[in-house]
UniProtKB/Swiss-Prot annotation:
It is a peripheral membrane protein. It comes from Homo sapiens. GO terms for molecular function: cytoskeletal protein binding; guanyl-nucleotide exchange factor activity; small GTPase binding. Intramolecular interaction between the DH domain and the PH domains can stabilize the protein in an autoinhibited conformation. This is FERM, ARHGEF and pleckstrin domain-containing protein 1. The lineage of its organism: Eukaryota, Metazoa, Chordata, Craniata, Vertebrata. Functions as a guanine nucleotide exchange factor for RAC1. May play a role in semaphorin signaling. Plays a role in the assembly and disassembly of dendritic filopodia, the formation of dendritic spines, regulation of dendrite length and ultimately the formation of synapses.
């Protein structure tokens, strides 16, 4: 007999030394005794598509086979991987590590078991070994080829360019094209070849280890990274897909994520036959706990997905492997399953404690010609990449950050992201190539816990720019880098922003909410730097003038949303009638030009004020003359200002009459640059006049009459007061008009919300008492009707109207004693009565006062029976069905209660959603006050558990803080809605030891912000208090309110 030829092991093929006995067991533990008996040969397909045969005892548990594979590879972090195979019913399942192999793989000779990544951590820098990252990179390559990792063309080309750099080394066009012709990394690769080659040219000098690092940096930001879809249906029979990730359970429609249930919200997971059940924890103000139900293809499919969910929860959320429960002696009921293996925390601790030897290895593609690979050893590069990633100056913001929760970047529907978005700035790369190419720049957007930051869930249509040179090394930080897919998954090669990652204990939020919260790797401002900082004048007038400058910068950016971004998009799409174009853009462009010059004058004056010792003599320490000159110039633009209300009405009428224009405007609002509702930007010029008036009032109050600047300030104040008085009535009318149209986008099930004479009064969250107990509902109060709605599992994130109570003839009474529910009210209408409960006494009093006022107004009106709001045309309801809809159906309000077929993408972070998550309310009075309280400027930010301060450009508007890396950025990186937050000054026990610091906290979330002067500190406190106290401020009927109502 001839000798059997020895096949190379995976470890030797990769160039690893002989097996050093590395095990996935904790130190001090012994492996279970290997069962004796017949050996069975099992074929394992590795991530590089080669196959290896392993002989294991037939009765051995699955863990023996997985350990054998990991030992063969000398893989220390084997816990992230698993073995999957098709069972006897052709369902792909994971090998159970506790069950005997023979009971799982019935016919080993005919089955190929795949060694693949099972648990995808939120941050690739948590993978300590270069070999582990290499295997993850192979998994990404495989997912791209199989169509699992969907993304836009730019992202795909950038990913493939890093794969090519890892496989063949530095750029050579002929070699690149030859290699791409022989290797297909993605379907329709030919169309991307030029872009791949172009990106590859930017990676010169990048080693394979760095290429893997950058590949994972980009891939982890894509929404479909690590996602395995499991087909299911909701209760209505709508086809959806379920998936599980490190953050919780996700719901997709196609490749679009439409909902997420983070582990913190899930109380219990179970299945019953084909039904998969998620029992959610009850809200703080609701005794009723919701149970979501999904229907899967079979019991086996359902059980398989249930086991995957249990394993993900244990691996990412538990500190140690759960202990086995004793088996019942006589009877057992239902299925039981226990996670076996180390948790992620145990793996991280084991590797950090040095319980292993770092293994050098060679890759499958070893013949590469990278410049730096000739000069550096792989281990040195690896450690340097990690060190640089940990020192990254990328912006981060928050605790419990979560991955983007918007739509996936699927081909054909994603926005095109150009290489080189204007206004962005490069951030430090882990390494720089000899050519000195700049690193791809970035930003952040992401969604958190339901009471965390809200980040715009939208995409960006960037302006076309020439490609910027790039090393391709996106910031390899485990924190928020400067790059963004902003919950849409698309990654641009340069000057684009990517979303933040998750920490191991990160909690996912609803599609609305999202974060930027991580304390590590933030740029720091220490005391030494503070000592070298520029010293500003101490005069309060200087800081008032500086406020004009900082807010003017924001105002110009807001104008550019219309004059630049919206106009350029309109010209490309040709979706707007010429008459509407001529009404909007010619009335905004003169304002932008005028205020650009105005800002230059202010900044020149401030520069002289700051920098000259003889400024007092040369008459530079004043701003009144500049204000007076430019306000007089603004009076010549009054004709354009008068046209803005007409433009707003024309735009909304055009949207109502044209489906194409409606879709176009909705798509534009999903772009990152449009960080507020589009129609809000049309009212910005009117709001800006009030800000000038406030600033001048403060200057006049500050200066004594004898001051040289007093006369100019007083004259400018008189001029601007006259303009505000002329436009005040129009502004009040337009604010209500704009708010009605904004609410219309958040609601489904109504059609004629915007009618002449209807005034918005209050919106907010209340609990409605029904047969199932108290259930959270969203209420909308107008001057003629009260609507109540619920938010379902919809792709659009809108609220469905379930009831309408005309205010005419309504009575309201407190009924705490009758129902035994705190802060309870009974609303008795002529056709229907409902019982509701507020979250607090103050919240109940505000609702009572506003509803009673609205009832009184309705009684005085000449229309005792206002027309009910009609159902929207898409609902296609008959009159009988419409009447039935008024009586709320409990089945209709269940988890998967609405069809997902015809829902359009919708912003999920509006004020309605914030009130829903924070369980509070806001009134039109609050909105009017918020218009007057807008502020911009630099602040230093610190977390409660950190020592360093991070400098951010912060814009406060619309009850929300928007965070930018600098004032030159075109869109915010993240935002923090302030409703529900408390504003205080840190106590001595918090050991801040800095001046001008204020504290924002909500539940467990605490942020410290530091201003540069006493004046700016007081101003930030003033404007933020207007938002944080809006939920608790006693209701006072202002002059504005009386005009509105």
């Amino acid at each position: 007999m001839g000798e059997i030829e020895q096949r190379p092991t995976p470890g030797s093929r990769l160039g690893a030394p002989e097996n050093s006995g590395i095990s996935t067991l904790e130190r001090g533990q012994k492996p279970p005794p290997t069962p004796s008996g017949k050996l069975v040969s099992i074929k394992i397909q590795m991530l590089d598509d080669t196959q290896e045969a392993f002989e294991v005892p037939q009765r051995a548990p699955g863990k023996v086979l997985l350990d054998a594979v990991c030992n063969h590879l000398n893989l220390v972090e084997g816990d992230y991987f698993g073995l999957e195979f098709p069972d006897h019913k052709k369902i792909t399942v994971w090998l159970d590590l506790l069950k005997p192999i023979v009971k799982q793989i019935r016919r080993p000779k005919h089955v190929v078991v795949k060694f693949v990544v099972k648990f995808f951590p939120p941050d690739h820098t948590q993978l300590q070994e270069e070999l582990t990252r290499y295997l993850f990179a192979l998994q990404v390559k495989q997912d791209l080829a199989q169509g699992r990792l969907t993304c836009n063309d730019t992202s795909a080309a950038l990913l493939i360019s890093h794969i090519v750099q890892s496989e063949i080394g530095d750029f050579d066009e002929a070699l690149d094209r030859e290699h791409l012709a022989k290797n297909k990394y993605i379907p329709q690769q030919d169309a991307l070849e030029d872009k791949i080659v172009e990106f590859h040219h930017n990676h010169i000098g990048q080693t394979p280890a760095e290429s893997d690092f950058q590949l994972l940096e980009i891939a982890r930001r894509l929404e479909m990274y690590g996602i395995r879809l499991h087909p299911a249906k909701d209760r209505e029979g709508t086809k959806i897909n379920l998936a599980v990730a490190n953050t919780g359970i996700l719901v997709f429609q196609g490749f679009t994520k439409i909902n997420a249930f983070n582990w913190a919200k899930v109380r219990k997971l179970s299945f019953k036959r084909k039904r998969f059940l998620i029992k959610l924890r009850p809200d703080a103000n609701s005794a009723y706990q919701d149970t979501l139900e999904f229907l899967m293809a079979s019991r086996d499919f359902c059980k398989s997905f249930w086991k995957i969910c249990v394993e993900h929860h244990a691996f990412f959320r538990l500190f140690e492997e759960p202990k086995p429960k004793p088996k019942p002696v006589l009877f057992s009921r239902g299925s039981s399953f226990r996670f076996s293996g180390r948790t992620q925390k145990q793996v991280l601790d084991y590797v950090k404690e040095g319980g292993h030897k770092k293994v050098q290895f060679e890759r499958k593609h070893s013949k590469i010609h990278s410049i730096r690979s000739l000069a550096s050893q792989p281990t040195e590069l690896n450690s340097e990449v990690l060190e640089q990633s940990q020192q990254s100056t990328s912006l981060t913001f928050g605790e419990g950050a979560e991955s983007p929760g918007g739509q996936s970047c699927r081909r054909g529907k994603e926005p095109k992201v150009s290489a080189g978005e204007p206004g962005s700035h490069p951030s430090p790369a882990p390494r720089r190539s000899p050519a000195g190419n700049k690193q791809a720049d970035g930003a952040a957007s992401a969604p958190t816990e339901e009471e965390e930051e809200v980040v715009k869930d939208r995409t960006q249509q960037s302006k076309p720019q020439p490609p910027q040179p790039s090393t391709g090394s996106l910031t390899g930080s485990p924190h928020l880098s400067e790059l963004s897919v902003n919950s849409q998954g698309g990654v641009a090669p340069a000057n684009v922003t990517l979303s933040p990652n998750l920490s191991p204990d990160t909690k996912q939020a609803s599609p609305l909410i999202s974060p930027l919260l991580n304390d590590q790797a933030c740029p720091r401002t220490d005391d030494e730097d503070e000592g070298r900082r520029k010293r500003f004048p101490t005069d309060k007038a200087y800081f008032i003038a500086k406020e004009v400058s900082t807010t003017e910068r924001t105002y110009l950016k807001d104008l550019e949303v219309i004059t630049s971004w919206f106009q350029s998009t309109v010209s490309k799409e040709d979706a707007m009638p010429e008459a509407l174009k001529s009404l909007i853009f010619p009335n905004f462009e003169p304002l932008h030009k005028f205020h650009t010059n105005f800002l230059k004058e202010i900044e020149q004056r401030l520069a002289l004020w700051e920098g000259r010792s003889n400024a007092q003599i040369r008459d530079y320490q004043r701003i009144g003359d500049v204000m007076l000159k430019n306000i007089q110039g603004m009076k010549h633009l009054a004709a354009h200002l008068w046209k803005h209300s007409e433009a707003l009405e024309a735009l909304e009428n055009g949207i109502k009459s044209s489906r194409r224009l409606e879709n176009f405007c909705r798509d534009f609002e999903l772009q990152k640059v449009c960080y507020l509702p589009l129609n809000t930007f049309l009212l910005r010029p009117l709001h800006r006049l009030m800000h000038y008036k406030q600033v001048l009032e403060r200057l006049c109050k500050h200066h004594p009459p004898s001051h040289a600047d007093f006369r100019d300030c007083r004259a400018a104040l008189a001029e601007i007061t006259e303009m505000v008085a002329q436009l005040h009535g129009t502004m009040i009318k337009m604010e209500n008009f704009q708010k009605l149209h904004e609410l219309k986008k958040d609601l489904i099930g109504i059609d004629n919300l915007v009618v002449p004479g209807r005034e918005f009064i209050r919106l907010g969250s209340l609990s409605k008492l029904s047969g199932k107990g108290l259930q959270q509902r969203m209420f909308f109060l107008f001057n003629d009707v009260l609507l109540y709605t619920s938010r379902g599992l919809t792709a659009s994130n809108q609220f469905k109207v379930h009831g309408q109570l005309p205010l005419y003839g309504m009575t309201i009474e407190e009924s705490e004693d009758e129902w035994g529910v705190p802060h309870c009210l009974t609303l008795r209408g002529q056709r229907q009565s409902i019982i509701v409960a507020a979250s607090s006494r103050s919240e109940m009093e505000k609702w009572v006062e506003d509803i009673q006022m609205a009832i009184d107004l309705a009684e005085k009106s000449s229309s005792p029976a206002p027309e009910f709001l009609a159902s929207s045309p898409p609902d296609n309801k008959s009159p009988d069905e419409a009447t039935a809809a008024d009586q709320e159906s409990e089945d209709d309000l269940s988890a998967s209660r609405t069809s997902l077929e015809r829902q359009a993408p919708h912003r999920g972070n509006t004020m309605v959603h914030v009130c829903w998550h924070r369980n509070t309310s806001v009134s039109m009075v609050d909105f009017s006050i918020a218009v007057e309280n807008q502020l911009s400027g630099n602040l230093l930010r610190k977390f409660k558990n950190s020592n360093g301060w991070q400098k951010l450009w912060v814009v406060f508007t619309n009850f929300c803080l928007f965070f930018y890396k600098s004032h030159q950025d075109n869109h915010p990186l993240a935002s923090l809605p302030l409703l529900g937050y408390s504003l205080t000054i840190p106590s001595e026990s918090e050991n801040i030891q800095k001046d001008y610091v204020f504290k924002l906290h909500f539940k467990s979330h605490v942020y410290y912000f530091r201003a540069e002067s006493e004046y700016t500190f007081e101003r930030w406190m003033e404007v933020i208090r207007s938002a944080t106290s809006s939920a608790s401020r006693p209701h006072v009927l202002s002059h504005k309110e009386s005009l509105v109502y």
